[in-house]
Amino acid sequence: MTEELKLMGANRRDQLLLWLKESKSPLTGGELAKKANVSRQVIVQDISLLKAKNVPIIATSQGYVYMDAAAQQHQQAERIIACLHGPERTEEELQLIVDEGVTVKDVKIEHPVYGDLTAAIQVGTRKEVSHFIKKINSTNAAYLSQLTDGVHLHTLTAPDEHRIDQACQALEEAGILIKD
């Protein structure tokens, strides 16, 4: 690979980072590929390289998001909760959480071979929940919790603890929250 091509790659990654920083909503790999006039696979590789340099980019079901320090601090309260339900109740679970003004940051399971597996979800509204569910259904992807008979963890974030308490109460009333 020539020095010029490496520079082009670095310039492209700089531009990707700029687009992500400027965007008010997630950008898909396809959207970024079209803007950069490259394949989606090139974008996936570029994002991986940026993440390897500790650039705070997360992949969500809606696309890539740049998480700057201000955005990360905007949600002050954070809590990990344990849940149990079948895949048919995932939409209900997520809606109960977001209806209280809480964002579901991720889902985590403890796999018997691989250990902890975590996937970013980043849903904070019913619209985002709907998009997430549609994406799962349209791709025939399995929920991580299906690997653990429905047991899973979520990291929740909100402007305050009270909202997370309200979401937990709603989940408990629905029989989804695992309490100790």
Swiss-Prot record:
Keywords: DNA-binding, Repressor, Transcription, Transcription regulation. Disruption phenotype: No visible phenotype when grown in the absence of nicotinic acid. InterPro entries: 3H_dom_sf, 3H_domain, HTH_11, NadR, WH-like_DNA-bd_sf, WH_DNA-bd_sf. Gene3D superfamilies: 3H domain (3.30.1340.20), Winged helix-like DNA-binding domain superfamily/Winged helix DNA-binding domain (1.10.10.10). It comes from Bacillus subtilis (strain 168). It comes from the Bacteria. GO terms for molecular function: DNA binding; small molecule binding. In the presence of nicotinic acid represses transcription of the nadBCA and nifS-nadR operons. Also binds to DNA upstream of the niaP gene, probably regulating it as well. May bind nicotinic acid. This is Transcription repressor NadR. Homodimer. Pfam families: 3H (PF02829), HTH_11 (PF08279).
